[in-house]
């Protein structure tokens, strides 16, 4: 099966998930991430703001706030590159491109990724860290330059 067909199949499976089972799985995945050494030891969490079919990240974001970590979420630029901006609350977000929640305030751009983790959306990945995302290549471009810890949520 080629990458395009696999992506379509996985999207259909995600959309067909029972809401209660998805919520249970999301909470388990969030809990596992929050228990990792990488999360506990980082100062900054770069994290996507989830939509309905992605692994929910709002619990991760709120936990990071509670754990006094800096939280940054992405903005998709016109060239499909990503820029991350610090937020202090989920209330600082509004719907942007692709109907994705993005920070309203663009004054606090992240320019130092030291001691950070990046929580990455994915449809699937292998044990070597190769992932299939949602097809625009935004994270692929960012991750090719990012030297911190990358954690895929699938």
Language-model segments: residues:
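Surface-exposed, charge/polar-rich loops and edge strands
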Residues: 5, 12-15, 113-118, 127-131, ...
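Short glycine-rich anion-binding loops that position phosphate/pyrophosphate groups of nucleotides
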Residues: 51-53, 123-127
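Charged helix-capping and loop-helix junction motifs
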Residues: 61, 133-138
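N-terminal active-site beta-alpha-beta segment that forms phosphate/nucleotide-binding
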Residues: 1-113
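A structured binding-face within diverse protein domains that lines the active/interaction site
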Residues: 101-103, 121-124
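Redox-cofactor binding/interface segments in oxidoreductases and associated redox assembly factors
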Residues: 47, 120-121
């Amino acid at each position: 099966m080629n990458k395009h067909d696999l992506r379509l199949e996985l999207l259909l499976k995600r959309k067909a998930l029972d809401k209660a089972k998805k919520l249970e799985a999301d909470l388990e995945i969030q809990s596992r991430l929050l228990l990792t050494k990488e999360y506990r030891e980082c100062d900054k969490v770069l994290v996507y703001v989830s939509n309905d079919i992605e692994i929910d990240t709002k619990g991760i974001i709120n936990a990071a706030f509670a754990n006094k970590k800096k939280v940054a979420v992405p903005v998709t630029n016109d060239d499909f590159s990503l820029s991350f901006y610090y937020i202090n609350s989920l209330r600082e977000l509004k719907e942007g491109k692709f109907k994705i929640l993005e920070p309203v305030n663009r004054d606090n751009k992240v320019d130092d990724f030291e001691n950070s983790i990046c929580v990455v959306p994915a449809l699937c990945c292998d044990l070597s860290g190769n992932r299939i995302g949602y097809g625009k290549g935004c994270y692929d471009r960012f991750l090719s330059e990012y030297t911190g810890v990358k954690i895929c949520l699938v």
